[in-house]
Amino acid sequence: MPKMKSNKGASKRFKKTAGGIKFKHATKRHILTKRTTKNKRQLRPNSLLPKCEVAAVARMLPYA
């Protein structure tokens, strides 16, 4: 049986840890002058994926 392929987009965006699947928030690259300081601060830390999306991402990353 051939090896399963990982989804390359998902492998660059998500990291599996003991606590769950970690991801970085979007909209933090450029044009940040429109955003409030509070909003930028809330987007700063990495977060864990919600339970409802874990199964879908896990299917995309069979070897993670």
UniProtKB/Swiss-Prot annotation:
Gene3D superfamilies: 4.10.410.60. SUPFAM superfamilies: L35p-like. GO terms for biological process: translation. Keywords: Ribonucleoprotein, Ribosomal protein. One of its GO terms (cellular component) is cytosolic large ribosomal subunit. Disulfide bonds: none annotated. GO terms for molecular function: structural constituent of ribosome. The keyword Ribosomal protein applies. It holds the Pfam family Ribosomal_L35p. Belongs to the bacterial ribosomal protein bL35 family. This is Large ribosomal subunit protein bL35. The lineage of its organism: Bacteria, Pseudomonadati, Pseudomonadota, Gammaproteobacteria, Vibrionales.
